[in-house]
Amino acid sequence: MQNTVDSGAEAGSSNELPAVEASNVRKTFGEFVALDDVNLQVHPGQLISLLGPSGSGKTTLLNIFAGFLRPTHGVVQFHGEDMTVVPPHQRGIGVVFQHYALFPHMTVGQNVGYPLRVRRMSRDHIKDKTKKALATVQLDAFEDRRVEQLSGGQKQRVALARAIVFEPKIILMDEPLSALDKQLREHMQIELRELHERLNATTIYVTHDQREALTLSDEIAVLNHGRIMQQGTPMDLYEDPKNSFVADFVGETSMISVTRTGEKSVQFGGNELETRSVVPEADPLYLAIRTEKLLVLDPDSEATGNVFSGRVRHAVYQGESMRLFIDIDGDTEVSVRRLCQAGDTMVMPKSGDNVRLHLPPESTVVVTD
């Protein structure tokens, strides 16, 4: 079956050729299907993330774009030119790897200038371009340092500088921040986004971290079992997922099996809820509830619409928020995340408490498989 995608983003003019395009790309390793007729377009200047769990095919697709793998079937084009069998060194792309791949016997400057030496550019040209690339990643003063003298974040900046030193139109990144600690990773995400906006190079970024993809991307393509499940802007995927996999994988979500009871209503257990949009006539159906959109009502609240009851199983303090795990109807669990705000007078429920929950109709998302 051809794997088409639902794209909610507009990028580039309708007459503009995609910077990168995969057409009916399939990749097999023996009997294993790593990519199943994938179609993807990346417009010039976009940063698109390939997001998915381990084994979803995202790195395989990136390696096909890089030329490290050849598709079993299908075509890869850059700016309308067929690149399917073109070797990696002739594709004119910058690549940033997960583990930096820096040369330990070279200085920072020598590492960054290496792609230019391979291209046999003049010494003065290499020196000027190296300094410019290091300045771009804010490592001007590190040109003569050895790699072993650098922190993880500095090594990643050197890898970025090496990828951009020859000013490629296309940059590929394979989980470049996964080896960094959480605080540094989040800081580098902002730096990467700012760098992308300055360079305006088309960038394809592989990650399994949905928050990282939401932070960085103009568009996200969500993959699972070698297929693109949905492609669109971060807001499209978060607010309007097209299937249960995307709804569950992107964001913190409770998935509840429901039954259609009307054009805009569903039911689970003895609870009937109004929905924001027309419920598809399909089976199975799931109500995808974002943790931050499910509200715990005050005990004296008189709210009635889209209200249901449960019992707190666990209450977990997470610093800026409380996370509540609540049993509904004995066999269904939902999760609620509530921010801890200054001046908040509501008493936070604790384990064993009975609570009433409210899901506004505008926050309902109903999806199928």
Where are these regions (language model features)?
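The feature captures the beta-strand-to-loop junction immediately N-terminal to the Walker
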Residues: L51-P53
